[in-house]
């Protein structure tokens, strides 16, 4: 077993019983793959698939003019390179995007020739706007901020059958309906009403009889009846009527006459119910014709028009009911045969026949006109318009698109073998749907479950972007069509037709303000990954949270292995926003698939098959915890499994698939909760949601008890830095790592050096700190994909969201009542939960009417203390400690001293004189913020002079870039000279520097005495070697040129003006790092949904302590466990204690300098006792010592979800650590030194500090802004508002009879404007008198009443 660089340093002991045969898939694959397929940027134009941008262009082009004499064809598209990289876009507030250019061809046809010939062809590349590019981590940078496009779960196109569950009609009768949903186009609904008529609706408009639609499609009534009914045939011979008998059709009917054979045998007597036995008897007798009385025909419905053969006269139309009168006419015409519809009340209803009767249309045209009137009320129906509308509804590819998915789902549902076909509807499609609907009403078939994941599909970012791009192109198409008619006369080129604005605005709107384009949750690496794996049922074309019912939100059996049943928000969005399960992926149709191991001949193989929800239901699938031996043969006779979405038991030879892993059913966040199987689902939901809110601590600490997936999340999120190629660490400092790449991995022509610039103290979207730290040293040998630097919340390449705290479960003086948390002062003093938050503040210098605002240090009335922090440009220096109210950027705005006369205004305008008086509009530190200035960025518009500070920032940036280039050049040169030395040593020279003799052999000593760049002047006898030397020299010269060009490009980028909003001359951004220590009121939580607020920070000496004198860090209330049913936290605490103590044992061995073999033996006892076996023999002695040093703070354990440590294994570890197997110990009161009455559960728990910090919530105001109308103080911290004294608070004061306090609250402390001023004056004078007047809101009320026409006057008393 091979370990990666970081894994070797600290191996996590896993209790997993079953090794997963499938590695964890790349967690961001859904996003990245979807957008790659959309762009197809790396694929040659000729080989691109018809998807994404290619499909959007193909769907709109070619565009033809109205007269068909000019055509615009699309050939291919090309994506350019982005101007700025991701980091530069974030700093400058730009969108990380690439220019899109489409090559189009304009063809002008000569219509006047006998046959259309090509007159002129013009080809050109046309700019189509900018397309945002995805970053390596699956996000987008839009206007400088990172955003995520959330995938949408919507109802798949296709046909769906359902009923109203008896809710529509008071009788509870089930009303069936069918709906054909296209990807794009009109919805078509079919439905039954309570009277059993069948109606259709288009786009949920007024309903019409379904036969109207059938007639509009060209079907006659007789054809409609023939399609939907089976017929009964009657033969009329010599005034006798014979019935062609099909015995099966008579079952359940009441015999109206004796059923007799020709020889007189009575099979069924009159008025008897025909049973299955009667039917069998009739079939055995092979009776095909029976005589029936005339009355039997009464009430039957004619299947076809009844025509008098002699005269050709139509006696009765198809669908007419046979009455006595009609029967008489039939006798007279001497018809030999009559066909009627076979209907009954039980399972062959006359629904279409009834509907045909209420249909008022007579022929195809009248039916189409009726549909036109329903769709376009008020418009006159001309024949052309009627036909155009009807054909455009479902038959036109431009207007209607069922999509490949829709066609597949449609064909599968109506029972066709072929799963592909036209993406528009055909007449057969509509007929088939109505047939199935009628069959459902007749009691045959099943309705669809719309919450089944086989009926819901995922639209990922690529598909969503494609739809927006297509919508933009469709707008372009209209404009192009108009202009194409002028193509020939005005000699226009292709770029004259295409205006890219509609396309770029559609894309910009989608990425900037769509409901599915969300501001990325960047609190910690897990929240990033989870956000990108989120699946939302909301958004355009989806559900709304008001209309979504319980069923849509509920967990469905098909969610198994596809969508996490645990992770979803609490509140109004519950169940509508879900998370993709750990191993799930989407297939080509957008349906979620999950992997299974195939079972062949009763043996579990290692072959992995992905199944969608539709495919899965037909198989018998065992769970991952099924027991099987080494050969894959099940050991149990009966195995728990799933079949047809039900949990059941099956014999082992019936099993067809097995789950891939126990963690398959949950999402990333839920799979990070150890002992998840022991937690109640509600608490697990809170636990997975709260992990996303954990603030990165100053020093990340790996969880002692994890699940083994921590490394995957840290690496896949992009937070931890991985090597692109293997190599040796050449240089490392806090901000950069230089790696000399292995020769085997460096491709020809590539630079054999990789430089990783680390992110230092950068602000995330949530103001948390992103900081990367190297974990390698110079000389370390690395492989590809090794972790070389930790990011926020990662420790040695593992996710570390919180800190391991020593926990005691016990009450303590009521301070941990109701989930409150008691914390030791040591936790604060050791900076265990201290976090850094970075605030971004911006000052903007604008052009005003009176002149330009100036950023300067020369500010009126500024104290020396404040001015000392500013440099000569008026900008705060980096490293300054600032507090609320301090000046960060000095800025003055010109102000008009007096109101100018028009003449003065004119003179000012002519002579360009600026205002002489200025006011201070400097950027101050807002209330509640104090910290250290860590960075300043200055952006200047093109043409505006840069100040000294701005020039210095550019010089520093160029210096850093130059250092990178110098390192690259140093390694490239060293590599080149090394190759040259190997090439030259021992070769015969033809001459060279330092008087190298002809035909002498070149030695290493000679080369050392010659300057290296003169080696290339050596002339060699062997031409081949000379050529190789020349190639090395050329390659070196080429690299130098490339580096010079790169430096020039960087210099050009930094020196050019910045894009700023209109009217802005200069913008200064100041970044302040705020250190937040733990304090009372901060919210903390474990990973099991056990959350609480810190009630008190207790001195270390007062905390309960153990027998060895170790005080506990945190005291939790034991009553928080039983009612919440999250026992996982107790097991975590036990195992955490064992982990810590084992670490101490390892540390003691290191301290006493024990032999490496002893340490190996002890580590073997830990790692290879139970669970997953670790190969410690593959480690060298120094690697074992490095591992032991890293384990001294605690041996990390992994207890995978649903496959974790058992109670016996926890006890075993406690025993190995020399701890009581109960996990409890006697604690002593820190204040009295007395032992507590009974042993207390003590151990280590991974505790998180959540992003609900009391500093962000606490807020105080004395005076501040007031509302304009009511003159009452504003509300909320952001507005620096006051606390609302509401109705109930008024009642409280009234109840106490505190009339003066109440008057003060409602007047001078609120909206009595004059009273406020007077109170201020009286306080200044030292006289605390209150003179309450009229509240402003009362005046507002008076005005309101006056507006209603009631005059109110106030009288003075």
Curated annotation (Swiss-Prot):
UniProt KW keywords: DNA-directed RNA polymerase, Nucleotidyltransferase, Transcription, Transferase
Cellular component terms per the entry's GO annotation: DNA-directed RNA polymerase complex
Disulfide pattern: none
Keyword Transferase: yes
Catalytic activity, reaction form: RNA(n) + a ribonucleoside 5'-triphosphate = RNA(n+1) + diphosphate
Pfam families: RNA_pol_Rpb2_1, RNA_pol_Rpb2_2, RNA_pol_Rpb2_3, RNA_pol_Rpb2_45, RNA_pol_Rpb2_6, RNA_pol_Rpb2_7
Gene Ontology biological process terms in this record: DNA-templated transcription
Principal EC category: transferase
Keyword Transferase: yes
Molecular function per GO: DNA binding; DNA-directed RNA polymerase activity; ribonucleoside binding
PROSITE patterns per the UniProt record, alphabetical: RNA_POL_BETA
InterPro entries xref list: DNA-dir_RNA_pol_bsu_ext_1_sf (IPR042107), DNA-dir_RNA_pol_bsu_external_1 (IPR019462), DNA-dir_RNA_pol_su2 (IPR015712), DNA-dir_RNAP_su2_dom (IPR007120), DNA-dir_RNAP_su2_hyb_sf (IPR037033), RNA_pol_bsu_bac (IPR010243), RNA_pol_bsu_CS (IPR007121), RNA_pol_bsu_protrusion (IPR007644)
EC number(s) reported in the record: 2.7.7.6
Biological function: DNA-dependent RNA polymerase catalyzes the transcription of DNA into RNA using the four ribonucleoside triphosphates as substrates.
HAMAP family: RNApol_bact_RpoB (MF_01321)
Subunit and interaction comment: The RNAP catalytic core consists of 2 alpha, 1 beta, 1 beta' and 1 omega subunit. When a sigma factor is associated with the core the holoenzyme is formed, which can initiate transcription.
Family named by the database record: Belongs to the RNA polymerase beta chain family.
Name of this chain's protein: DNA-directed RNA polymerase subunit beta
Gene that specifies this protein: rpoB
